[in-house]
Regions:
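Face-selective signature of the C-terminal outer-membrane beta-barrel domain
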Residues: 243-265, 290-449, 469, 540, ...
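N-terminal periplasmic accessory domains that precede
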Residues: 64-67, 93-97, 107-108, 124, ...
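Short acidic/polar hinge/loop motifs at secondary-structure boundaries
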Residues: 112-140, 188
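Outer-membrane beta-barrel signature, preferentially recognizing the C-terminal barrel domain
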Residues: 290-298, 350, 411-413, 484-539, ...
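C-terminal beta-signal and adjacent terminal beta-strands/loops
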Residues: 4, 648-651, 672-732
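Gram-negative outer-membrane beta-barrel transporters
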Residues: 543-546, 565-650
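Transmembrane beta-barrel wall of Gram-negative outer-membrane proteins
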Residues: 178-213, 224-271, 292-312, 464
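Extracytoplasmic beta-strand/coil segments of soluble accessory domains associated
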Residues: 39-42, 65-117
Length: 732
């Protein structure tokens, strides 16, 4: 409690002025913009907002996702309910979260959570036909009856019930990239019910073609030119995803669901590189070519069973089994006219498996209190293999691409984790609720291969979630939570760089078998105001995080080489303010215009392990600003809009032992025009930005020794060009 009070005091000092300013601004806007609508959703006493299907009828939506886009403030709910400080260091959220947990993505289908991590409720929103929806709920309160917990809001999609019904939705699309390449794709889904069985099937193959061009200019410490590098990368892929969800109602008190997903993503990627060495009076040109194919295949099988007892208590079991296989190969050649000479070979494979089962029992303690108790068992396994071959003149091997073996690393990591939890929900009054969680976690991580060891961990993770409905439209929420992040087991072993923008001078990433989990105490306060008559929503979130064992780069240098690896670099703090607004422009006579804005301000502080100086967390930045507009024109069966997002420059820096990399603001835009036309089909035209990104990389000799000595300054920018897309959608 002492830690909490001191932390909250620091937050108050940092943000009291900003909070007052924005709160005043929000209420001023709310008063001025509250204009009535002809059709309004209903708001229950428990602050649940219900949108019947008739609310969306005039917009002729194609999918559930289209319906949600018309709801003011839906961006807050679709953010996973994490608030302004969601994610980041020390967080266990997202598809990489620890096990199943009680959260998920805060989307329910017919009041039930889909048992999956890669195949959750949010993934189904663009696949389910709007014609199958009876109503949509935005649940702003807490309840022991909810299948997910912990989010600021929960979206519940309730589908129509009938003895026999089905609906097919399909989409044909084509992307045009800036090199005039046309890449087709398609989606199809079937949603239906037959007696006690409900089902959902879908398949999609999406274009993922990309042409990336970049230029890099490098200078030496004295300002003289070093070299210039031009790169052109082509990537061609069409990932295929198949999904099936089935439900069976044995009786009014017994339900079961099965969920399946399989996906395949085989990428063909090639890179051409032109290097101009400017250290000579006449620049020396050299050419390189790389082949970088990547093949991925994954599947997931999950399910749940629920039984409701006569006294209203519930027993529920969920399980998930999944696997992902990933193979990345990199072969680099020096090019001389038509001759190619291979000088680098990398083969990196990973196989990840999870086996999770979660069981809980929920019952009423008193009329206004409920308790859920349960246990979760999760096994996670990772098998890795890395082969690195170089042209050194030594003995060669076919397994290393016909080059000399340099690295042959193999490893296996297994985590066996047990989680025991109790969740108490207390409706203090018809306007106040408090949900408290106590979770104990016990795990063992074993490693074998190049390094063999076993380590045990245990954590106690409490959480308090308090909500006060000041009015049905105005809600205050505050949470205090201890969180533990999932480790990336790939950091334990030596691996290859596979991401775009990786360092040409670094062939592999070192592993660190001594990593421990990031932990955090997370404090958040949230104020949400829903304007009368569905005119809009204003949401303000203030957060402060105390971080322990933050993961960053640490020194693992040898006598011969300066090396770093991901490791725990100490404690840190992160704090910020997020304001979201979603307003209908009824005051301009345009009630079907929805203006959405977002302002995210954040800062952080940690001690750099190499220099001992205070700095921000790697790649966290200072926040971003977003604005979007959607205009529905029902009389013409059309809508149009745009979304723009820009990050603040000057603080998005990645820190390493021998370099720093500063990234510019991530500006992006997206616009569309959509209309219902010939054949009753929906035609949608989209335009996406050219994705220009810039980076300044400063190389040092070794930052652990004084200032390390400046070695090189690199400035680079890349673009993937604008993308135009045409989509044709229909249902029957």
């Amino acid at each position: 409690m002492v830690v909490f009070l001191s932390s909250f005091s620091r937050v108050a000092q940092k943000f009291s002025c900003l909070f007052s300013l924005f709160a005043a601004l929000g209420f001023t806007v709310a008063v001025n913009y509250s204009y009535a609508q002809d059709i309004s959703p209903s708001t229950d006493q428990d602050a649940t907002v219900t949108y019947p299907a008739t609310y969306f009828a005039e917009f002729d939506p194609y999918s559930v996702s289209d319906m949600l886009d018309r709801i003011p403030g839906i961006n807050v709910a679709r953010g996973g309910g994490q608030g302004g400080g969601g994610g980041g260091p020390g967080s266990s959220g997202g598809s990489n979260r620890r096990g199943l947990g009680a959260g998920g993505d805060q989307v329910l289908i017919n009041g039930r959570r889909i048992a999956g991590k890669e195949n959750e409720g949010n993934d189904q929103l663009s696949r389910i036909s709007a014609s199958q929806v009876e109503y949509i709920e935005i649940i702003r309160g807490t309840s022991g009856d909810l299948d997910v917990r912990g989010g600021s809001q929960v979206i519940n999609i309730v589908l129509l019930e009938s003895e026999s019904s089905s609906s097919i939705a399909y989409e044909l699309n084509v992307d045009r990239t800036w090199d005039s390449a046309y890449n087709p794709g398609a989606k199809v889904s079937l949603t239906g019910q037959r007696g006690a069985v409900d089902y959902f099937l879908s398949g999609e193959r999406e274009p993922r073609y990309e042409l990336n061009q970049s230029r890099e200019d490098s200078v030496l410490p004295d300002g003289s030119p070093n070299d210039r590098i031009q790169r052109e990368t082509k990537q061609d892929a069409q990932p295929l995803t198949l999904v099936g969800n089935f439900g069976y109602e044995f009786s009014e008190r017994d339900l079961a669901h099965l969920n399946l997903q399989w996906s395949e993503d085989n990428q063909d990627r090639e890179l051409d590189r032109i290097i101009a060495d400017d250290k000579f009076e006449n620049p020396v040109l050299s050419l390189q070519f790389e082949e970088l194919p990547r093949d991925s295949e994954s599947w997931e099988f999950g399910g749940d069973y629920e039984h409701e007892f006569l006294n209203g208590s519930r027993f529920k079991t969920l399980f998930i089994v999944n696997e992902k296989d990933d193979l990345f190969t990199r072969e680099r050649y020096d090019v001389d006219n038509l001759d190619r000479s291979k000088n680098l070979f990398i083969s990196s494979s990973e196989r990840t498996r999870e086996r999770i089962v979660r069981t809980s029992y929920t019952f009423d303690v008193f009329d206004t209190q409920s308790l859920e108790v349960g246990v979760e068992r999760a096994q996670t396994l990772l098998d890795t293999s890395l082969q690195l071959g170089l042209l050194t003149g030594g003995e060669v091997s076919d397994r290393f691409g016909g080059l000399t073996p340099v690295t042959d690393a193999n490893g296996m990591v297994e985590e066996m984790r047990y989680e025991y939890f109790a969740v108490h929900n207390w409706q203090l009054s018809n306007r106040m609720s408090m949900e408290s969680t106590l979770l104990f976690e016990d795990s063992t991580i074993k490693q074998s291969g190049d390094i063999s060891q076993s380590r045990d961990f245990d954590f106690v993770r409490p959480k308090i979630d308090y909500r006060f409905d000041i009015t049905p439209s105005l809600q205050f929420r505050t949470t205090i939570e201890k969180d533990v992040a999932q480790l990336s087991f790939g950091d334990f072993t030596t691996s290859a760089q596979t991401n775009r923008g990786s360092d040409d001078d670094q062939n592999q990433l070192e592993g660190n078998p001594d990593l421990v989990q990031e932990q955090s105490w997370r404090y958040e306060a949230n104020l949400e105001y829903r304007l009368p008559n569905d005119s809009g929503v204003i949401n303000t979130n203030l957060f402060y995080h105390e971080l322990e064992d933050v993961i960053g780069k640490v020194d693992v240098s040898t006598v011969e080489d300066v090396l770093s690896a991901n490791g725990n670099i100490g404690d840190a703090e992160r704090y910020g303010l997020k304001i979201d607004s979603s307003l209908r422009l009824g005051f301009l006579g345009q009630p079907n215009m929805l203006l959405t804005t977002g302002l995210n301000l954040e800062d952080s502080e940690i001690t750099d392990p190499f220099t001992g100086m205070k700095r921000r967390l790697s790649r966290r930045g200072r926040g971003n600003l977003s604005i979007g507009l959607r205009h529905d024109i029902p009389s013409r069966n059309m809508n149009w809009g745009f979304n723009v997002n820009d990050g603040f420059d000057g603080a998005n820096i990645n820190y390493d032992i021998d370099k720093t990399e500063e990234y510019g603001g991530s500006y992006s835009y997206f616009s569309w025009v959509e209309m219902v036309g010939w054949g009753g089909l929906t035609y949608r035209f989209e335009a996406r930005d050219n994705n220009i990104r810039c980076r300044t990389r400063i190389r040092f000799e070794n930052r652990t020794i004084g200032d390390g000595g400046l070695r090189e300054l690199e400035k680079s920018c890349f673009t993937t060009g604008a993308v135009l897309a045409l989509k044709v959608r229909g249902t029957f």
